[in-house]
């Protein structure tokens, strides 16, 4: 009789282990879902709208001394339209890819790519002057999107890649 109970316990233990091995991955924490499913795609979409529909304002906010004013050169307009298209595509891809899966590996792969893009985005404003990175009292609306918001996104991505906020896998409670 004891052997039967032992085998039943062992089989039950094996069944539980099999279920745990095939369980879906832990969901992505709420903060990351809020930032990467909503906040970033909406802000990127906003950038697309301004780059396409408000080109003179976009250029003026980027660097007023070199902005051409209301008469935007055709080449500049084409480049801004292309930028708007890239922002639109990025916004839709991020929102749709991350909504399609809870697989943290997929999320992390995208976060690595976007983190590299964050560094490129920050580097792209260097011609404005090094103080653009820290002189917050001089920032305008587009600077807030280009600098502190990108800092925030990069830090949030780093936290996600480091596993901050995720439940630890394989942690077992000590039985007494």
Name each model-derived stretch.
Residues 41-72:
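Hydrophobic transmembrane helix segments
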Residues 75-98, 113-119:
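Core segments of alpha-helical transmembrane spans in multipass integral membrane proteins
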